[in-house]
Amino acid sequence: MTGQQRALRWLAAGVLVLWCGGFLRAENTEKSMVRALILTPPTVAVQSWMVSLLYQFPEAAADASDAAAKVQLCTGQGNTLQTALTEAERGLPRKASYRLCEYLLLNAETTLKTIRQAETVLKEEPVQGLSARVLCMDLSGEELAAADGENELFPEQLLQVVKEAAPQAPHLYESRNALLAPVLILTDGAIENAEEMLLLTETGNTRLTPAESQMAQLLLGQSGEHTFPLDGGQVTFRRCVVSVEAVEDGFAVTLTGQRRAGTALPTAAQCAALEQLCVQTVQRCWENGYDLLSLGAVRALKQGTGREALTTKNACPQVQADVSFLQF
């Protein structure tokens, strides 16, 4: 190898090292990592969009969702969602990166129409947030800003509660005709996950009761334990298999559950109460525009597509539920 070749190799190696160093610095320390987007649509009182960003800087730029940098909050307002987002980004110490943005928080007064508007913006670069988990907050943008001003740890606490509630939350891309989202509330300055869930449909928003919320999650097959306070004590489903069958003009819903270890087998009266709650939840969702168990699809599979499609525009069909638990 000649001296000129060695010099060229050393030069190439030096350029590579400099490029790698610059790339790593740009990726890992020079960006504000947005962890959650908080959207508040226009209201009668405030006729503009408000966007808040939960972010970490700079350590959070590592490729780990558990980055340890301090969580902070910045807010922007604008006549459109895009201008409000741009204004919020101006409050960041560095350019925004949405690589770790896994959550979309919406005001509890948000409609499905608002979510459609948000999808249009969030699917674009650089956000690309259609896979984000959707949660609702029972507080306005002003209340959010006030809570942040009173407690410097509020953003950290908010992100922690969001993470805990995330398994119950749907992805944004799942919000075709309806969305069933957990609700965060502010109590004595602390943020917490409410027991009720919010059903957003084309016809409006409906707040489910705590029992209906648990049953809806169970019927949707969401993982985790589901507990119901009933006469005679709590009943907890550790696991549950849900089956739906079209029977004549109605439907039969069967829930076969496994109880929590160390608990007594639920009584016949408790199973009957759960059956009633199941029917009540399915009917309430249907009446508010949400086919919780995809009954229309079940009917179409059995009868074919030649007959009139069953949708929530029709009266809710008869639903009969049967709840049983395994002996072990």
Please report, for each region that a protein language model flagged, where it lies by residue.
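Membrane-proximal alpha-helical signals and transmembrane carboxylates
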Residues: 2-328
